[in-house]
């Protein structure tokens, strides 16, 4: 069973989503199915079929979340440190050509959100940065060609 690395924040978010699905969404869809059933003939009951489809989606997501939480390897980023880039690090990098700076936090796959500056540990940028230190350069393969980045700052918070 492969472990899934995630921050405490990411773990809490998955638990919160699971709680909502089990305590709010599941009972709501069961009530909707019951209501649709009361309308008679199920073979031509679009409301019933839509509710059953939604139930299938919700049950699938619950199963997926249960599995991810069971395999979670929760990493407390506040207890990490050092100068090397690892999971949980907040890294400031600069494009070697343009000198544009960007800051990313390296997180688990389910937590990744580029708009919030969070990238997956399995992303090309994160894979290129892992193990680097401040001042090191990392080359990232991109669709438009390879880009070189310099590690400016590594922080664990």
Swiss-Prot record:
InterPro entries: GreA/GreB_C_sf, TF_GreA/GreB_CS, Tscrpt_elong_fac_GreA, Tscrpt_elong_fac_GreA/B, Tscrpt_elong_fac_GreA/B_C, Tscrpt_elong_fac_GreA/B_fam, Tscrpt_elong_fac_GreA/B_N, Tscrpt_elong_fac_GreA/B_N_sf. GO terms for molecular function: DNA binding; RNA polymerase binding. Pfam families: GreA_GreB, GreA_GreB_N. The keyword Manganese does not apply. Coiled coil: none annotated. GO terms for biological process: DNA-templated transcription elongation; regulation of DNA-templated transcription elongation. PROSITE patterns: GREAB_1 (PS00829), GREAB_2 (PS00830). The keyword Lipid metabolism does not apply. It comes from the Bacteria. Keywords: DNA-binding, Transcription, Transcription regulation. Necessary for efficient RNA polymerase transcription elongation past template-encoded arresting sites. The arresting sites in DNA have the property of trapping a certain fraction of elongating RNA polymerases that pass through, resulting in locked ternary complexes. Cleavage of the nascent transcript by cleavage factors such as GreA or GreB allows the resumption of elongation from the new 3'terminus. GreA releases sequences of 2 to 3 nucleotides. Belongs to the GreA/GreB family. This is Transcription elongation factor GreA. It comes from Hyphomonas neptunium (strain ATCC 15444). The gene is greA.
